[in-house]
Amino acid sequence: ETEMRFIQNMGQLFQKEEEANGIVRNIQSALDEGIAKAREAPARRVITSEFMRDKIEVFGDKLLSGDIIRKLGSTNIQFDTPFISREELRMCGADTLFIVYHGNEQEGANALAQIQVPEFSDIPAVKNGRVFLLPYRNVCASHVYTAQTIREISNGLYFY
């Protein structure tokens, strides 16, 4: 809702209300489609994370990706802090992982390689091939990418 309000406000500010309303309709449509598909599938236990040099950041309920995951009927695995250890990730029991990355496709491949190591091979999501990439721009202040982000998360949750 916050993303949609922001887009509508920007549309008013720049006198582009019709364009803004079209973007908002697209976001709502993506959300409605995802919710309908979520009703037909089991809820997932999800972690959205970003590998940093020496730590792992977790994107929980309070961020856009977490909000989308909840709206699509799944659960974000919660931690007390925004950063977790490799051991906490290994023991989390997530059946779906979204890995956030910055940059181009090669950066995405590098981020994905962080989870595809023997240390994490027992995580259900890794075992079952349910690890998906999300570009950073799509999960933090996504605005015009919000509908795309909803579709990417929905596909990861329910189509693989």
Where are these regions (language model features)?
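Extracytoplasmic/periplasmic, Sec-exported soluble proteins
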Residues: 1-2, 16-26, 53, 57-61, ...
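Structured C-terminal subdomain patch of bacterial secreted/periplasmic proteins
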Residues: 2-5, 12, 21, 38, ...
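A residue-level marker of the well-folded mature domains of exported/periplasmic proteins
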Residues: 10, 15-17, 58-59, 69, ...
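Basic- and aromatic-lined ligand-binding clefts that recognize polyanionic substrates
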Residues: 19-72
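A local structural motif
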Residues: 70-80
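Structural motif corresponding to alpha-helix initiation and N-cap regions
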Residues: 82-86, 117
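Proline-aspartate-enriched helix->loop->beta-strand connector
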Residues: 86-99
